[in-house]
Amino acid sequence: MSIAADPPPEDAPRVSRRGRPARYTQDDLVAVVAQVFLERGYDAASMEDLARASGLTKSSLYHHVSGKEQLLRLAVNRALDALDGVFEDEARQADSPVRRLEHVVRRTTEVLVAELPYVTLLLRLRGNTEVEREALERRRSVDARLAGLVQDAMDAGQIRSDIDPRLVTRLLFGMVNSLVEWYRPGGHSPHGPAGGPVAPTVPTSRDEAIVQAVVELALDGLHARRD
């Protein structure tokens, strides 16, 4: 999908008011919108703010979306779809329960690194709108699926069973989700350059080391105790 600003004169370069390309894909637009929501807050951000940040007019923006609720849904669904994909992939794993659990912890951490602005936005939702409530319900489903994996590994005697699986789930996601507070890809802001789309995150050796540290800390602490 391509989203264009109002057409300039034929001999004018195709740039927006701020010097950015006047033609956006939907992913480009959602990246800019996510940045504005993170910086201003969803409730405080207006369609005027979103149009100004994207270099579109409000009328052009409304031509392609019904309002900021739709844009919020597109942004948080990017995170949720990636998380759902982790569990769809896990369901195809034929390994032991603890290996499937390790796979999910690793992949959810990789998703957070790759989709940092969108996961950050998801974690800031408070359920004030229908879109937010729908997203939070999907997030609870992700929590429940992880809890099921934890229980399976406990039942198989592969991780310690003296801790409530629901608490284990909260602690695992708490460790992973805490990355949004301090992790910065390449040492830069996770929200992209001011007024521009969030650049895709390319995994680095540092990213891989962080992912591995999360997996090892989580799983080493859960290993079944041997008398």
Please annotate each region the language model reported.
Residues M1-R40, A44-L56, E69-R73:
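Basic, helix-initiating cap at the start of DNA-binding domains
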Residues E39-D43, Q93-A94, E115, A156:
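Short coil/turn segments at alpha/beta junctions that flank glycine-rich nucleotide-binding fingerprints
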Residues S59:
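Key DNA-contact positions within bacterial/archaeal DNA-binding proteins
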Residues M1-S16, E110, A114, D143-A156, ...:
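C-terminal peripheral helix-coil segments that are non-catalytic and often amphipathic
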Residues L74, G85-A114, P165, T169-L172:
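Hydrophobic alpha-helical connector segments
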